[in-house]
């Protein structure tokens, strides 16, 4: 396995485990909740917190066609995919405050972008 460096830490064979706390859609549309998740992850000893950067429009079409509605047999039955992705997407204007809290807590922050616009946004954020 290749050894890589993430935020000054070596990651690879023979290196200590690099623990990543995944926030993704667990924010529930609540910025204070995200900030608390970052603080708790840092206090628990995680090395990094990972977000997901996307918009509903970059994930699916905003249509009512049957193939874009969740089928029976799961908790989201009858829900439109676009609505679910809109709820799961983290507002981009939250990122500066999340980054500031992560920096103050000494935990690395990064995100998985899902489309070119998200990549551009994250590059702009530093």
PLM features: residue spans?
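Glycine-rich, proline-tolerant flexible connector loops at the mouths of alpha/beta enzymes
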Residues: 47-89
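Glycine-rich anion/phosphate-binding loops
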Residues: 27-43, 91-93
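N-terminal amphipathic alpha-helix/helix-capping segment at the start of soluble metabolic enzymes
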Residues: 1-20, 95
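Catalytic domains of carbohydrate-active enzymes, especially glycoside hydrolases
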Residues: 36-55, 125-126
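Active-site beta->alpha loop and helix N-cap motifs at the rims of alpha/beta catalytic domains
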Residues: 74-126
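Active-site beta-loop-alpha junctions enriched in small/polar residues
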Residues: 24-26, 52-56, 114-116
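Hydrophobic faces of well-ordered beta-strands that scaffold small-molecule active sites
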Residues: 19-21, 49-51, 109-112
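Conserved, mostly hydrophobic/aromatic
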Residues: 22, 41, 122
